[in-house]
Amino acid sequence: MTLPSLTKLLLKAKKEKNLSFEDLGNLINRDEVWVASLFYGQATASEEEATSLIAALDLTSDLKEDLSTPPVKGCLDPVIPTDPLIYRFYEIMQVYGLPMKDVIQEKFGDGIMSAIDFSIEVDKVEDPKGDRVLVKMCGKFLPYKKW
């Protein structure tokens, strides 16, 4: 997958400034995953957020428009992912997608989980047998309309 030039520029500046997504999130009062999604062109910053990030990363102010314009979302390559970490999420959906769907629909009825009214958190859970990744997704349930 080829990354957009804006993504490359933001990631390079973040690395040069030795900042984490958490650092940048704290600066603008946003979650680290949201900031990462902004860097990858999947979120829209307010003008104030864009200005703060540009200043922290020592970038030019002309990037404010790029960061605050709604992007085309979900534009990853339409093939099975090859990055090992991203592939595991694909694999998780292959194995657990239908079971998750059934459990969600047993609890909520016929509908979907919003990816718009949505948040995601990633945490590290220390474990003597090997650290664990905890991913929490929270999306509004949207029932299908009957007519």
Swiss-Prot record:
Active site, per annotation: 88, 91, 114
Mind telling me which SUPFAM superfamilies this protein's record contains?
A: Cyanase C-terminal domain, lambda repressor-like DNA-binding domains
Enzyme class, spelled out? lyase
Instruction: List its EC numbers.
Output: 4.2.1.104
> Catalytic activity annotated for this protein?
cyanate + hydrogencarbonate + 3 H(+) = NH4(+) + 2 CO2
Q: Which domain of life is it from?
A: Bacteria
Got any disulfides in this one, which pairs?
none
Name a single GO biological process: cyanate metabolic process
The record ties this protein, via InterPro entries, to: Cyanase, Cyanate_lyase_C, Cyanate_lyase_C_sf, CYNS_N, Lambda_DNA-bd_dom_sf
GO molecular function terms attached to this record: cyanate hydratase activity; DNA binding
Which UniProt keywords are present, listed alphabetically? Lyase
Q: Which family does it belong to?
A: Belongs to the cyanase family.
Functional note: Catalyzes the reaction of cyanate with bicarbonate to produce ammonia and carbon dioxide.
State the protein's name. Cyanate hydratase
Organism name: Prochlorococcus marinus subsp. pastoris (strain CCMP1986 / NIES-2087 / MED4)
